[in-house]
Amino acid sequence: VQELLGGKFGEMSTFMNYTYQSFNFRNRQGARPFYDLLASIAAEEFGHIELVSAAINTMLTGAADGTPGESGSLADVKGTRNTQQFIAGGASALVQDSMGKPWSGDYVNATGDLIGDLTHNFFLETGARNNKLKVYEMVEHPAARALTGYLLVRGGVHQVAYARALENLTGADMMKLFPSPRIPTDKIPECQPHIKRGEHLKLYRFSQDDFKELAAVFNGPHPETGEPLTVAEEIHPEGAPAFDLPAQPAVFAPGPEPQEIEEIAAKLREGAGLPKEPTGVVAQNANGNSNGHADADDVMETVKDAIS
């Protein structure tokens, strides 16, 4: 799953490619529909980075349980492919690929040539979806399979979006010229909840007032199903606070004595005149509440259900 985060065709690459293409876009007003397309998809990719990281963190939760200094606390992970996740990463996601190679800015293609960049994006999504299917076939963890099912659907929308943009600019039907990868999402169980909600047909604007010209590019029939492509009325997909992963003392995350940090935080809140309980919600436990912690099995099942 790390490959889907920090690999050449991972979510870091899609996010940073589209982000810098939108940052560097010249004559934005004159070419608004295409700028709106890049900026909107870049915003969604930012969320995908968080989503992949959440899946990785869920998979690693419990893998390094134990007490520092006690024999065997990390014995079960010493033979893993990437021990850096436990030594340097706190049993969590790293900005690396599946073999520990760091993600690189060299993966970003932002030439300023709109047709060239859109063509690059089309094939970037092609490679990304290809890798997602391979990872799906390699994993059994339910959160990982739920993740890949979702990303296969949303990545397909982005691939179609870039194909439609190129067709509008050049007349070339990319989906007919390059019908790849052939991924039967209708036969993948983890894709079904998202397809039933129409997530394979719509793009989001991630803004109440901006990026409305996206509709000038993203329209017409879906090349595989014939259903109409639409810009969603809701500004973004429904989300939820991240899950409050339990402390992992063996890797000092968030420290060797997590309770001490909680006690210090409580005293600081009291000194600042804040309520006894933390204000707002930045995380929820496996039961969907904002208080308490969950064990590894609870986190795994709840993240799987939430992604689905």
Cite the ranges covered by each PLM segment.
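Non-heme di-metal
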Residues: 1-288, 292-307
